[in-house]
């Protein structure tokens, strides 16, 4: 007896993506589930065929083999190895239970980092998934702290059925295969093995009349609006945990958590290193030579006075204590380190040039000790590598 085409079994075309396959399997599995069709051998057989089709088409390798060779890929001598079958060896009810659990138990298990707790195949409540939200703020926001309103797409308990999955006014049905235990025992020779119930996926109950709003899942996708307080002192990469603000749990389980990941934008003036701030400030050649008091910007938005000593050079660093960032866990503020760079005058008029030349003529080595020392070293170097007549010294 020839087998039906797996794509035909699920009612999809050969270009169907993973989402389409899962939706089609879910629809067919609910339709032919044995607990919905008690005593119907034909429905039970079709339920297994649907599971077999999905197990092949949802696996990229098996699907590729099936597309090339059809059902022959899983028969004796086929491309998947002699006699393996689409389930890779074991086969049977446990594999259908795995598929059923994967599709129905994790229908809303998206994103975040938590996932469900308690393990597959266990009846009862399951914790919702954790969620991640990325928030970009300015350096000023990191200094002052801020309150932000965010919108987070998440799975929430269906209001119509209160997260139970069944249409209001109907009851969850006890699984007839495991009698509500969620697990069954099978004997193989001298051994007795316990496994997840293949009919209810380990829940012990099943939804006979699905809720019209959530289609029996118990959760729906919605966008939540939350108020988030970003504390002063947060750094780039800081993670803020909002307990219980993640995905809704399954079957009355607790919600997961929401994690806010902070990203601090680069600033035009300041660079940050932990609690300390760095900025570069210009000074004229005259200011640097004679010394002066200049005004430098602060992260608060104001200005602070800083004294420049006489003869300051480019690269000189000066520390302003307590003018940096607040610390997230308390304690004194960091410092602001100001780095000086001396500007060389440009676009000089003739008179300015004359004055600079006059200044240069009056300057002695004492005015430019670094330059004098450098040129003395150069002269000494040339004396060592050349002869008296200017030729390179062979020695």
From Swiss-Prot:
Describe, by residue range, where the zinc fingers (CR-type) fall in the chain: 145-223
Subunit comment: Homodimer.
Show the taxonomic lineage.
Answer: Bacteria, Pseudomonadati, Pseudomonadota, Alphaproteobacteria, Maricaulales
First and last residues of every CXXCXGXG motif repeat: 158-165, 175-182, 197-204, 211-218
Q: Which HAMAP family match?
A: DnaJ
Q: Return the protein name.
A: Chaperone protein DnaJ
Q: Is this entry keyworded Lyase?
A: no
User: What does the entry list as the binding residues for Zn(2+) 2?
Assistant: 175, 178, 197, 200
The record, for InterPro entries, names:
DnaJ, DnaJ_C, DnaJ_domain, DnaJ_domain_CS, HSP40/DnaJ_pept-bd, HSP_DnaJ_Cys-rich_dom, HSP_DnaJ_Cys-rich_dom_sf, J_dom_sf
Which family does the UniProt entry place this protein in? Belongs to the DnaJ family.
List positions binding Zn(2+) 1: 158, 161, 211, 214
Query: Which cofactor is essential here?
Result: Zn(2+)
- Name the gene for this chain: dnaJ
Q: Which SMART domains match?
A: DnaJ
Q: What are the recorded GO MF terms, alphabetically? A: ATP binding; heat shock protein binding; unfolded protein binding; zinc ion binding
User: Superkingdom of this entry's organism?
Assistant: Bacteria
């Amino acid at each position: 007896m020839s087998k039906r085409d797996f794509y035909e079994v699920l009612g999809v075309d050969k270009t169907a993506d993973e989402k389409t396959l899962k939706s089609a399997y879910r629809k067919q599995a609910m339709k032919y589930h044995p607990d919905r069709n008690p005593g119907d051998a034909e429905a039970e057989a079709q339920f297994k065929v649907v599971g077999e089709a999905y197990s092949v088409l949802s696996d990229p390798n098996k699907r590729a083999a099936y597309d090339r060779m059809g059902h022959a890929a899983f028969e004796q001598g086929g491309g998947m190895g002699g006699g393996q079958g689409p389930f890779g060896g074991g086969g049977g009810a446990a594999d259908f239970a795995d598929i059923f659990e994967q599709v129905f138990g994790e229908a809303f298990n998206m994103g975040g980092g938590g996932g469900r707790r308690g393990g597959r195949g266990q009846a009862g409540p399951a914790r919702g998934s954790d969620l991640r939200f990325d928030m970009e703020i300015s350096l000023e926001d990191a200094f002052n702290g801020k309150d932000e309103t965010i919108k987070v797409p998440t799975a929430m308990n269906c209001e119509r059925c209160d997260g139970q999955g069944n249409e209001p006014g109907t009851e969850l049905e006890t699984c007839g295969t495991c009698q509500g235990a969620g697990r069954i025992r099978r004997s193989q020779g001298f051994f007795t093995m316990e496994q997840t119930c293949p009919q209810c996926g380990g829940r012990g109950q099943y939804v006979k009349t699905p809720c019209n709003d959530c289609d029996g899942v118990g959760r729906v996708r919605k966008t939540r609006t939350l108020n988030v307080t970003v504390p002063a002192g947060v750094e780039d990469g800081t993670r803020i945990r909002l307990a219980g603000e993640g995905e809704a749990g399954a079957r009355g389980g607790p919600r997961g958590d929401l994690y806010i990941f902070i990203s601090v934008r680069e600033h035009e003036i300041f660079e940050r290193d932990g609690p300390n701030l760095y900025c570069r400030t210009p000074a004229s050649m005259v200011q640097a030579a004679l010394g002066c008091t200049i005004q430098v910007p602060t992260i608060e938005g104001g200005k602070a006075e800083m004294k420049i000593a006489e003869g300051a050079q480019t690269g000189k660093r000066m520390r302003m204590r307590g003018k940096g960032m607040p610390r997230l866990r308390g304690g004194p503020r960091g410092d602001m380190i100001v780095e000086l760079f001396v500007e060389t005058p440009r676009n000089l008029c003739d008179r300015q040039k004359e004055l600079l030349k006059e200044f240069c003529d009056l300057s002695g080595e004492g005015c430019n000790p670094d330059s004098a020392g450098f040129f003395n070293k150069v002269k000494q170097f040339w004396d060592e590598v050349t002869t008296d007549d200017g030729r390179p010294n062979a020695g």
